Amino acid sequence: MGSNRGRKAGGGSQDFGAGLKYNSRLENMNGFEEGVEFLPANNAKKVEKRGPRRWVVLVAVLFSFLLLSLMAGLLVWHFHYRNVRVQKVFNGHLRITNEIFLDAYENSTSTEFISLASQVKEALKLLYNEVPVLGPYHKKSAVTAFSEGSVIAYYWSEFSIPPHLAEEVDRAMAVERVVTLPPRARALKSFVLTSVVAFPIDPRMLQRTQDNSCSFALHAHGAAVTRFTTPGFPNSPYPAHARCQWVLRGDADSVLSLTFRSFDVAPCDEHGSDLVTVYDSLSPMEPHAVVRLCGTFSPSYNLTFLSSQNVFLVTLITNTDRRHPGFEATFFQLPKMSSCGGFLSDTQGTFSSPYYPGHYPPNINCTWNIKVPNNRNVKVRFKLFYLVDPNVPVGSCTKDYVEINGEKYCGERSQFVVSSNSSKITVHFHSDHSYTDTGFLAEYLSYDSNDPCPGMFMCKTGRCIRKELRCDGWADCPDYSDERYCRCNATHQFTCKNQFCKPLFWVCDSVNDCGDGSDEEGCSCPAGSFKCSNGKCLPQSQKCNGKDNCGDGSDEASCDSVNVVSCTKYTYRCQNGLCLSKGNPECDGKTDCSDGSDEKNCDCGLRSFTKQARVVGGTNADEGEWPWQVSLHALGQGHLCGASLISPDWLVSAAHCFQDDKNFKYSDYTMWTAFLGLLDQSKRSASGVQELKLKRIITHPSFNDFTFDYDIALLELEKSVEYSTVVRPICLPDATHVFPAGKAIWVTGWGHTKEGGTGALILQKGEIRVINQTTCEDLMPQQITPRMMCVGFLSGGVDSCQGDSGGPLSSAEKDGRMFQAGVVSWGEGCAQRNKPGVYTRLPVVRDWIKEHTGV
């Protein structure tokens, strides 16, 4: 007992005095007390040291100290840093060409799997021993899976190496090898190994890779569809700080089609978001990653992926504690394509990337040889083109691409045409081992080389447009070639410095229509000046300086800086009565008011889905893309007007929708039904759609049914809505909110897709722009009031039509929130040139809305 206590005490507190060369304590030696006595000298001057000798001694002592320090440092380096090792882990795969795949290899606990895995590990060890920079530092390897072809082994290898050899090891492992290993041990038969490749991974992933607590293996059977989900889906969130994986297999000579039906994980951010990755392999190697996913996708988003062989690996790595349901996915097998491409010999036709509109598979090459009659030329028009790789700079076609006439095309491109000067053209499509996309949809056409666009104008891209669109001031060709080298009509056109022709009423409208700014030069205010809303010109330096230099406050509106200024109709007023110089400060994610009132009541304007589907031909909206859009149905008449949700109990619409006529009492709230969360008018009973009756209708008391001034109405719902992924409110702007000319805004509704056409079944969307108020008044004199705003394209083509009345104008503001800029009111015709749509301006009636709804 005493001995143990002595060792314990010694371990915690040592007698450091025993280790000192000199000790101030007196020691008992041989039983006697010893000391040191200094005797006085007979002649002090003789024994006194001379000055110069002292310096020699000091230098010697200093030199000795430095030498000892250097030796100590070298010893520390030798015994500590020289022995430091860096952990390197590599994921890889190899092919065993003289083996046949057995079904038992799918089960990692089977005798056959264990036996073959042991031999592969021994083969890897022998292989590394052949490389001087690898063999001495190889710690261990492990086989994680096998798949067909003859037999592909997936493995990881761990090395412990000196830091100065790290790069050499990386280079050695990056070499793809083809080797034959003779039997050097009893347990190792002769292996012919090809395609021995490996890629570095984060060593921290090794522990997660070895954890099988959230690992699943699934095999497709026949044509059946197999479903799998994250743990707990959809009733509880997936586990935090975990790694889950799904090994998906199909039969030999098949490929897999994988679709995520529902996808909701933590948002993508820079803080290490949760991540789902799909690999065209059974090893999580970056060069074989097909896609990485995070965030929330709408159900209609294209999340279908094809493998190049009969396996997929899906991993979920969670780094956050945020609670999300995860995903639901399905997969099935289909026969592997024996060839891709082909010979096309009709006068016209279509072709696409493999499995379009699903993502094309990795590692594929397709060639289409197109031949039309000898007396005709051929051109290819790509109607849709998505070949985007997240790791490739725009314009660099080094991975996935389409090649025609020696030129490569990649990325995301709008419709374009490639022509041949003969009756033949060859289109080649290539995808590498990683990251795939939707691909392309194309058509080929034959044409007369002497007249490629009969009776029409041909853009340099090969597109044909009507001749009257040439030099009309609007770019109808994607490359603007229809507006170049024009002679402008001085009566109604302005000649830009870049030789473009623009309508005269676009001059000095505060929008750079020419592109070079020449249509805004020489206007009422000189260069370097600011034009106040009252027409006064000020030096640019006086804008946003905290002083009302204009006299109407407009020089202090829309400022990035935040200053407390005198209150005007242009300044934002906080709840405490103070006014800010900053423009549109409400709900922008930054607290500007000292009382925080600018960031209150901001549960609005955000979509539940962070990822929306691409517009693939047409203007159909996506599910949940406009969750504040409402469809109003009149009894026995179906959809008549639109509306927007601004709170659980209130809608905003247009007053003219509720004016009685001799046949129907539209002002009677009992005649109306509101559908929220609706996308397709033919599926009003679909899951997520809420059908509600109205409680009352409030039209603006100043509404004029002749001029449509003050065209706005408030609708109270009979009961509160339930917010969901497809039902959310839009933000209402402050009375001082500014939607400047040129700003992009979205119009939505089920109205007619063209003038005189029928209503759409699927919710439609169109991007339009705010038009300068002066220009608007010039286009429609004596018709526009301060409560109205013009929005659209003066070139026509996109507009709201009958049936969209009462629907919202949605404007994306700071922080990504959507604010309602206006209400669809009226217009002359539908999508006509110089006839933009007219909308009720929301900020002007904001106080009236708040008075009646409290919103």
Curated annotation (Swiss-Prot):
<dbReference type="GO" id="GO:0005615">
    <property type="term" value="C:extracellular space"/>
</dbReference>
<comment type="similarity">
    <text>Belongs to the peptidase S1 family.</text>
</comment>
<dbReference type="GO" id="GO:0030163">
    <property type="term" value="P:protein catabolic process"/>
</dbReference>
<keyword id="KW-0677">Repeat</keyword>
<dbReference type="Pfam" id="PF00089">
    <property type="entry name" value="Trypsin"/>
</dbReference>
<dbReference type="GO" id="GO:0006508">
    <property type="term" value="P:proteolysis"/>
</dbReference>
<feature type="disulfide bond">
    <location>
        <begin position="587"/>
        <end position="602"/>
    </location>
</feature>
<feature type="glycosylation site" description="N-linked (GlcNAc...) asparagine">
    <location>
        <position position="107"/>
    </location>
</feature>
<dbReference type="GO" id="GO:0016323">
    <property type="term" value="C:basolateral plasma membrane"/>
</dbReference>
<dbReference type="GO" id="GO:0001843">
    <property type="term" value="P:neural tube closure"/>
</dbReference>
<keyword id="KW-0720">Serine protease</keyword>
<keyword id="KW-0325">Glycoprotein</keyword>
<feature type="topological domain" description="Cytoplasmic">
    <location>
        <begin position="1"/>
        <end position="55"/>
    </location>
</feature>
<feature type="disulfide bond">
    <location>
        <begin position="340"/>
        <end position="366"/>
    </location>
</feature>
<feature type="disulfide bond">
    <location>
        <begin position="453"/>
        <end position="464"/>
    </location>
</feature>
<comment type="function">
    <text>Exhibits trypsin-like activity as defined by cleavage of synthetic substrates with Arg or Lys as the P1 site. Involved in the terminal differentiation of keratinocytes through prostasin (PRSS8) activation and filaggrin (FLG) processing. Proteolytically cleaves and therefore activates TMPRSS13.</text>
</comment>
<feature type="glycosylation site" description="N-linked (GlcNAc...) asparagine">
    <location>
        <position position="365"/>
    </location>
</feature>
<dbReference type="InterPro" id="IPR000082">
    <property type="entry name" value="SEA_dom"/>
</dbReference>
<dbReference type="Pfam" id="PF00057">
    <property type="entry name" value="Ldl_recept_a"/>
</dbReference>
<feature type="disulfide bond">
    <location>
        <begin position="397"/>
        <end position="410"/>
    </location>
</feature>
<feature type="topological domain" description="Extracellular">
    <location>
        <begin position="77"/>
        <end position="855"/>
    </location>
</feature>
<feature type="domain" description="LDL-receptor class A 2">
    <location>
        <begin position="489"/>
        <end position="522"/>
    </location>
</feature>
<feature type="disulfide bond">
    <location>
        <begin position="574"/>
        <end position="593"/>
    </location>
</feature>
<dbReference type="InterPro" id="IPR001254">
    <property type="entry name" value="Trypsin_dom"/>
</dbReference>
<feature type="domain" description="CUB 2">
    <location>
        <begin position="340"/>
        <end position="444"/>
    </location>
</feature>
<feature type="disulfide bond">
    <location>
        <begin position="488"/>
        <end position="501"/>
    </location>
</feature>
<keyword id="KW-0597">Phosphoprotein</keyword>
<feature type="active site" description="Charge relay system">
    <location>
        <position position="711"/>
    </location>
</feature>
<feature type="domain" description="Peptidase S1">
    <location>
        <begin position="615"/>
        <end position="854"/>
    </location>
</feature>
<keyword id="KW-1133">Transmembrane helix</keyword>
<dbReference type="GO" id="GO:0009897">
    <property type="term" value="C:external side of plasma membrane"/>
</dbReference>
<dbReference type="InterPro" id="IPR036364">
    <property type="entry name" value="SEA_dom_sf"/>
</dbReference>
<dbReference type="Pfam" id="PF01390">
    <property type="entry name" value="SEA"/>
</dbReference>
<feature type="disulfide bond">
    <location>
        <begin position="567"/>
        <end position="579"/>
    </location>
</feature>
<feature type="glycosylation site" description="N-linked (GlcNAc...) asparagine">
    <location>
        <position position="302"/>
    </location>
</feature>
<feature type="active site" description="Charge relay system">
    <location>
        <position position="805"/>
    </location>
</feature>
<feature type="domain" description="LDL-receptor class A 4">
    <location>
        <begin position="565"/>
        <end position="604"/>
    </location>
</feature>
<feature type="glycosylation site" description="N-linked (GlcNAc...) asparagine">
    <location>
        <position position="772"/>
    </location>
</feature>
<comment type="subunit">
    <text>Interacts with CDCP1. May interact with TMEFF1.</text>
</comment>
<keyword id="KW-0472">Membrane</keyword>
<dbReference type="GO" id="GO:0004252">
    <property type="term" value="F:serine-type endopeptidase activity"/>
</dbReference>
<feature type="domain" description="CUB 1">
    <location>
        <begin position="214"/>
        <end position="331"/>
    </location>
</feature>
